[in-house]
Each structure stands twice: as C-alpha cells, then as structure tokens.
Curated annotation (Swiss-Prot):
GO terms for molecular function: FAD binding; oxidoreductase activity, acting on paired donors, with incorporation or reduction of molecular oxygen, NAD(P)H as one donor, and incorporation of one atom of oxygen. Keywords: FAD, Flavoprotein, Monooxygenase, Oxidoreductase. FAD-dependent monooxygenase; part of the gene cluster that mediates the biosynthesis of oxopyrrolidines, polyketide-amino acid hybrid compounds with feature structures of tetramic acid. Does not seem to play a role in oxopyrrolidines A and B biosynthesis. May be involved in further modifications of these oxopyrrolidines. Its EC number is 1.-.-.-. Disruption phenotype: Does not affect the production of oxopyrrolidines A and B. The gene is opdD. Pfam families: FAD_binding_3. This is FAD-dependent monooxygenase opdD. Belongs to the paxM FAD-dependent monooxygenase family. Pathway: Secondary metabolite biosynthesis.
Length: 524
C-alpha cells in the first residue's frame, strides 16, 4: 500500500486529515514514474509511464476547472507512515477510545444492540461492550464476518509474493536507469513462468524500498536470504544485481486473494463489514485500501444519522446496495490491470539472450515491449473507475434523465443521482466541495441577487418539520459551476454523492418525498 488515490484525498479533506497526511508522504514534487526493465544491469529501462507528480496534477486541477478533475491530487505514502499518522489523530480525538492489543472473541447481534466480547492482552480478562452498531474492519480473516456467518465468494489465487522492506542509500545503482516510483522487472517466461517476475517500489525517495518477488505456483526459489532475493529481482534477465543494503526491515510472504463477502451486514443489520473484511483484491490499480476508506465514509454518515435520530431504516440497508457493486467493479479492473502486466509474454516473445543486444533482433524486441506497455497503460489512470461509478440504492431518488456512459479512463461530470458530484472551483477560488456539510446539503444556484426560492424554502420547511439537519448552500452568479452541474437544485450527501437533482420542486410534498427518501425513511 503506497498509493492514496485522489478520491481518498477528497474524503480525507473534510475530515481535516488531507494536509497532515500529505506532509508525511513523499514530497509532492516527485513524479509517479513507472518503469519496465529487464534488469538494472542493463543501460536503460525498456519503457515507462510518465505519471504526473502531485504538484503537476494540482496545476492541472487548478487550470482545468471543468468538473472532470478531482479536488485533491493523489499521494505517495507508505502504509506504515499513514497508519502512524492516523493513530496519532485517533489518540488526539476525544471521540475515539483506543484499545491496542485487545482482541475480539465474539460478536453477537440482536434486534436492538450489539454485544462485542473483548479480551485484555495483559490480564487475559474479558469484558462485553454493548453498542447500537458495530463495524468489523478486521481484515481478510475477519472474526466479525465469521461470527455473522457470512461466507466469501472467491479466495486466494495460485501464486505468492515475497515482500522485502529494506533501507539502502545506494542510489547510484538503484537509479541507474533513472528515478522511479515503481519498476517492474521482466523475466523469460520459459524460466519464470510469467512475464513479470518482480518489482521495486521507492517508498520515500530517500532510503526506504520494497521489493516484490512474484512466485509462480510450485516455485523452488529459496527465501532464506533476503539480500540474495533482492539482488535476483533487481537483476532480472541479466542475473543478480548487488547493491549496498543498510538494513532489512521486514520480510514476509503474501498470497494474493480476490474475494467478496456475500453480505456486508449481519442478518439484523446492526453489524457491518468494511475494507478487507468484506472484499479483497490484488493491488494492481491501488484499489484495495482506498476502497476500504470509501466504505467507511459511506457507512459512517449513515450510522451517524441513525444514532442522531434523523436517519431511516433504508440508510443501513443502502450500504451493501451501494458498496458491494463498487467492490465488484474495482476487483474486475484490478484483474484487468494485472492481466495486462502478465500478458506481455503473450504479445512479445521475451528472450534474455537478445533483449539487450545491439543488433536488429534486440531492437525489435525492445520496440515491441515498448509498444505493448504504452498501449496498455491504464494501470494507474482509470479515473472513471475511481470517480465515475454510480451508487444504486433505495435512498437514491431516481431521475428520468440519462447519465453519461461509464468510461474507465475518464470521469464525465454529472449530478445524476447516485454519482459523485463534480468538483469545481467557484468564482472566489473556493471549492464547491467545501460548501458541503456533515449532513445533507442542498446546493442551490441563484442567478440574481440572493433571496429565498420556492425550492429552497420547501426543502428547508420539510427538514425542520422532520428534524433532518440540512445545509442550504446558495450560490449566486456561479454560471460556470451551474453549467457543469447541470441543475439548479442538487441534494448532496455527506460523502459527496448526489441524492437528487432538479431545476425546481413544485410543492412542499415533492420536497418532502425527496428528502425523506434521501434520509432513508421511504423506499423508492
């Protein structure tokens, strides 16, 4: 986990976490260059994807104010750095109680509450925590999922990956082919069984690295010596490539899994699953951790609404309706990206004896590899998958209008119900996302001087009568934003997704129907 997607940074922004995490990550000037190499012993890499730095992406966001861009650029930050940052924030919050080392032994769901039995690591004693709801974010082997009797579709795939985290300042040798974020190393498939045998990730652009050694089923390669594994992966087709290693931080073996929980909630809808507890995917595309954060951003506001008393029963049911199809979508594209990487050997006959040769055969092979890599570059560029998926659920107010067709590579701005609202900068330079509240927000575009409109008044009166907290963001003279959003009135959820849109509401009853459905009180 070393990529925090732009959508995740949008989520962290209203939580007050985006800037702090960015300060801990790789400096924003460094690009996301992905290289393809037959081994660092060769003079040059075979091809590269020149993905922009966070600064370059932010410049594009500022200049391309047409709704197609995210509000925040992506971020390079390793998982351990991110976890340490979030731990600090939890320790600072009076709303969070931390119990590190404690283990959950049993979760029991009833119609009115959840009983969670936990064990103290120091005394071995157990206690019961009673709550209205519980969320199992306890990983792929989730005890919460098992206690709820929820099965998984799918499971481990027939390969493994050896991960070695290490420190080295031998930059002359590591950067022989140029700086990189990732470098994938090609191997002769007649020897390795696959076209990509490993990779190296630059975790901090200073001295921390991770080598991935992809193991085919039945691999006889030894994993006893981490240094030898690193040399072999870096050398790829050219044989071992020694570097000076300052420290081996950790070595582990990981078995990739593609699995999806049959349900995201217990039978009584008081226990929920999020993250790897309900979906596991291969890391291609960087969807895994980012998907889990989006899960809890969706679920969090809904549980808050239930606890605060303004949410209806459909809210908790909508979590699975919305998030499980997104997991299926991202699992699919993760497999597509991995298939393109591993499919190189089917498109190009890789041969270690000629790949670095200066003759016509070597030149032809290198050119074919370059063409294949450039023609299959969606790996970290599927912004439609990230931003353009639709939430289908009973709390989304259906619309007779059509929505843009799904394009995995690009996001088409739309306020069609169920889609993420488009980011746009307003006339004063502020972001429209920063106008959203912690509950529902009615965005109201006003052409002339500000004043109450019938639409806004109907929604405001309905919200007051039914004790539904509603922010009304009246935007005056915002022609560009209104054109991009395509409607005069848009009801936006706390997670930035659209509940309803229209140019007007003709009556208070219509506003009531929209608001009560968006808050989960009526089913469509």
């Amino acid at each position: 986990m070393d990529l925090t997607l732009a959508r995740t940074m949008e989520i962290l922004r209203p939580l007050g976490l985006a800037d702090g995490l960015r300060a801990r990550g790789v400096p924003s000037t460094y690009p996301f260059t992905v290289r393809f190499s037959s081994g660092l012993g060769m003079k040059h890499s075979l091809s590269e994807w020149k993905l922009p730095s966070a600064d370059q992406l932010r410049e594009r966001i500022m200049s391309q104010n047409d709704g197609t861009m995210p509000l925040e650029p992506w971020l390079r930050v390793s998982g351990d750095v991110m976890e340490a940052f979030l731990k600090e924030k939890c320790e600072e919050s009076h709303l969070v109680t931390l119990r590190f080392g404690w283990s959950v032994t049993q979760v029991i769901e009833s119609a009115t509450e959840v009983e969670t039995r936990v064990r103290n690591p120091h005394t071995g004693g157990e206690k019961v925590i009673r709550s209205q709801y519980a969320v199992g974010c306890d990983g792929a082997s989730s005890l919460v999922r098992k206690n709820m009797g929820i099965a998984l579709d799918g499971g481990p795939i027939h390969s493994s990956v050896v991960l070695i985290h290490f420190k080295s300042r031998d930059l002359t040798r590591l950067h022989r082919q140029g700086r990189f974020w990732h470098t994938f190393f090609l191997l002769d498939p007649t020897i390795s069984g696959d076209s990509v045998g490993g990779a190296i990730i630059a975790q901090d652009e200073v001295d921390t690295w991770t080598v991935h050694d992809f193991r085919a089923p039945g691999s006889k390669q030894s994993i006893s010596c981490a240094e030898e594994t690193i040399y072999r992966v870096l050398g790829a087709m050219g044989g071992p490539y020694p570097i000076t290693i300052d420290e081996i931080i950790q070595q582990s073996t990981w078995t990739p899994s593609i699995a999806l929980a049959k349900s995201y909630t217990g039978p009584l809808h008081r226990v929920f699953l999020a993250g790897d507890a309900c979906h596991q995917t291969i890391p291609s595309g960087g969807y895994g951790m980012n998907m889990g954060i989006a899960d809890v951003f969706d679920l969090g506001w809904k549980l808050a609404a239930m606890i605060q008393g303004w949410g209806g029963a459909q809210l908790v049911l909508s979590y699975e309706q919305e998030r499980r199809p997104v997991a299926e979508l991202m699992q699919h594209w993760g497999k597509v990206h991995a298939g393109k990487l591993m499919g190189l050997a089917s498109a190009v006959t890789l041969n270690a004896t000629i790949i670095d040769a200066s003759d016509a055969r070597g030149e032809e092979m290198r050119q074919k590899i370059h063409e294949y890599v450039q023609s299959n570059d969606a790996h970290n560029q599927c912004f439609g998958v990230e931003h353009g998926h639709q939430h289908h659920s009973d709390i989304t107010v259906t619309s007779a209008s059509s929505h843009p067709p799904f394009d995995p590579r690009s996001y088409t701005p739309t306020t069609h119900p169920g889609f993420r609202a488009p980011h746009v900068f307003l006339n004063d330079g502020s972001a429209i996302f920063d106008k959203f509240g912690k509950t529902l927000t009615l965005v109201e575009f006003i052409d002339a001087m500000p004043g109450p409109s019938s639409g806004g008044s109907f929604f405001r009166d309905t919200a007051d009568e039914h004790h539904i907290p509603l922010r009304i963001a009246s935007l005056v003279g915002e022609a560009n934003a209104q054109q991009i959003w395509g409607a005069r009135l848009v009801l936006v959820r706390p997670d930035h997704f659209v509940s309803w849109c229209g140019n007007d509401v003709g009556s208070k009853d219509e506003a009531k129907r929209v608001l009560l459905q968006a808050a989960g009180h009526i089913c469509r």
